[in-house]
UniProtKB/Swiss-Prot annotation:
Binding-site residues, Fe cation: H177, D179, H234
Keywords: Ethylene biosynthesis, Fruit ripening, Iron, Metal-binding, Oxidoreductase, Vitamin C
Record-linked InterPro entries: DIOX_N, IPNS-like_FE2OG_OXY, IPNS-like_sf, Oxoglu/Fe-dep_dioxygenase_dom, Plant_2OG-oxidoreductases
Example of a GO MF term: L-ascorbic acid binding
Protein name: 1-aminocyclopropane-1-carboxylate oxidase 4
The Fe2OG dioxygenase domain, residue ranges: 153-253
Stated family: Belongs to the iron/ascorbate-dependent oxidoreductase family.
Catalytic activity: 1-aminocyclopropane-1-carboxylate + L-ascorbate + O2 = ethene + L-dehydroascorbate + hydrogen cyanide + CO2 + 2 H2O
GO biological process, one term: coumarin biosynthetic process
Length: 316
């Protein structure tokens, strides 16, 4: 089995640049995932985020999760649970407007630390999008502009904890899915594993590494690249020991952004993917998250065809 792609971003600044860009290209085309080290976010910032996130879970969320488990009788399940996940989560929105000051139970230090962390992640996401542009032969800023919409991109962080699970063979931490959006930056626990991706019909562990950022590509980048880059299925396996922390930050198109394959990436006039408004895709995704992505793309194609038909009738 090939090794999971680990990219040292510092190598972009020296003789290793061409090799590093090729590694990023290969990861985007064949894995849909890669792991970044030396990405520019200070280790002490990440350590503080981890300490405060785990402290907040212990103080505010652990007991609620235990009560939820008890109320649903999940400790005693005998058959596979297919309609919920073994995770405790909350969501922080950063762009276009922040909700950090409104989220209950966060102390002021945690709010400030997460605001700072989000700014650093936003900058890193935009740097990565430009590296993807370079590899794709697109002008710098193309992907950021494609995501922009009228109010800029959507950017937010799903803060998750995956507590010890008594029946990990019957309950997933997070069921298999692809991510609907753009580019996802994950700061995950370096001691408790669980994240897996599907490659060549095999589930492969994403290795926990201290101070790394795991990057994966969402459905919108598969569309814009006309399938050159892949959004892949992934899942979280619950563990019997240890609570796994995960902060997944989603840099997504704005709600009204119109998403379609970049014209320069359509070879021999073959456009594989549809044109659609991002918010329409998200409405469809909400009900189909844990199903394959291909039917979602087909549904958007049908919607696109209907829009074109209406336009033709209107102009006739």
């Amino acid at each position: 089995m090939e090794n999971f792609p680990i990219i040292n971003l510092e190598n972009l600044n020296g003789d290793e640049r061409a090799k590093t860009m090729e590694m990023i290209k290969d990861a985007c085309e064949n894995w849909g995932f890669f792991e970044l080290v030396n990405h520019g976010i200070p280790h002490e910032v990440m350590d503080t985020v981890e300490k405060l996130t785990k402290g907040h879970y212990k103080k505010c969320m652990e007991q609620r999760f235990k009560e939820l488990v008890a109320s649903k009788g999940l400790e005693a399940v005998q058959a596979e649970v297919t309609d919920l996940d073994w995770e405790s989560t909350f969501f922080l929105r950063h762009l276009p407007t922040s909700n950090i000051s409104q989220v209950p139970d966060l102390d002021e230090e945690y709010r400030e630390v997460m605001r700072d962390f989000a700014k650093r992640l936003e900058k890193l996401a935009e740097e990565l999008l430009d590296l993807l542009c370079e590899n794709l032969g697109l002008e710098k800023g193309y992907l950021k502009n494609a995501f922009y919409g009228s109010k800029g991109p959507n950017f937010g962080t799903k803060v998750s904890n995956y507590p010890p699970c008594p029946k990990p063979d019957l309950i997933k931490g997070l069921r298999a899915h692809t991510d609907a959006g753009g580019i996802i930056l994950l700061f995950q626990d370096d001691k408790v594993s669980g994240l897996q991706l599907l490659k060549d019909e095999q589930w492969i562990d994403v290795p926990p590494m201290r101070h790394s950022i795991v990057v994966n590509l969402g459905d919108q980048l598969e569309v814009i690249t006309n399938g050159k880059y892949k959004s892949v299925m992934h899942r979280v396996i619950a563990q019997t020991d240890g609570t796994r922390m995960s902060l997944a930050s989603f840099y997504n198109p704005g709600n009204d952004a119109v998403i379609y394959p970049a014209p320069s990436l359509i070879e021999e006039s073959k456009q594989v993917y549809p044109k659609f408004v991002f918010d329409d895709y998200m409405k469809l995704y909400a009900g189909l998250k844990f199903q394959p992505k291909e039917p979602r793309f087909e549904a958007m194609k049908a919607m696109e065809a209907n829009v074109e038909l209406v336009d033709q009738i209107a102009s006739a």
